[in-house]
Amino acid sequence: MVGKRDNKTSTPSVPHGRTLWAPHIFGPLKGVRVRVAASGSNAGHNVIVTEDGRCFTFGRNVKGQLGLGDEERRDIPTLVESLKDERVVGAACGRHHTLFLTDRGEVYSAGDNKCGQCGVGNTNPVLTATKVKHQGAPIVKVACGAEFSVILDCRGVVFTFGLPEYGQLGHNTDGKYFITSTKLGFNNETKPKRVLVFVEKGRDNHSTPVDEVEVRDVACGTNHTVAVDAKGRVFSWGFGGYGRLGHADTKDEMVPRRIKYFDTQTRGVKHVFAGSTYSMALTDNGNVFSWGMTKRTGEANMYPKPVQDLCGWDVRSIGCSVTSVMVAADESVIGWGCSPTYGELGLGDTKKSSANPTEVKTMDGLHVHAVEMGMAHTLMICRDDTEQDKANLADLPEYNI
């Protein structure tokens, strides 16, 4: 665990921790077998899922996104009592809301719901984990943008709900309407709605439907979504600023549009990832591509480009934050992100940021199963199966609240 403590103004009556500039063992979870760690590029809260399906949350809770029945921040992972009879297998975090996925393919949600992003059929706050109003095939993946949600079922069908701004729900509309001559409103989706149309566009901007799309992975940035199907075709939709959609322009896309760059490549994409203003893809042969804005200033990548510094690495997991990136590869962790950073790169207090991929030296020799990034922090799940694994982990300092 590395990164920034909470904002001083969030809950003044509660003491805050310190900024962690290098990786630490998270004391409250020491000895706990963790299956999933979830956060998000817009999120200041986290979800921990254990191997036996228990679900714990901690971090900011200003809208009840921890699902604990109140709006008090938690510094220590706290059991979500409303899910104690469920076996949780996955989770995703938006700005102020959370989705929880169970082994039965059901989805629960909690937190801010003013845009319907909790998917419970209304826009009332959701303080305890409540079942999303979805009927159909079991859900296998959940993802969250800032104020919208995406769920993927076992047939490869995508459903979205929440704020439709920029076309980020993929329903061929941005949902805008005028409440008065000077006040704008949105027709929010309060229940999951199927994404029906996937398209590709030619140079004349003419749209042609793409058939037989079975989505296998999906990821969300602040206001955009990227997905890959069973044939390795990559689609993106929503806000197009800084080229984060990968279509060589900055136009918003109201429905999923196929990224043409990958059509001419013999690189089957298997996973996609998204930060606030950028997207990434991992291919079957281990190559990593990035597009959009991964730094505070300067030029953006308007279409996918290979991350050359990662060539030759066996990449397993990628975590995306606001502009920072962390990668688990081989027996190392690699990170980069331009200043200002807040410790999420784990490079130490003397080298707090890096414009280029840099190995986190204190993680050398550690096998990281998964890396997840929040708004200004990083969570890593490390292997501890062997005596050597345990010895390597013992060299890390421990952080306790």
Which residues does each PLM region occupy?
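Eukaryote-biased RCC1-like beta-propeller repeat architecture
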Residues: 1-401
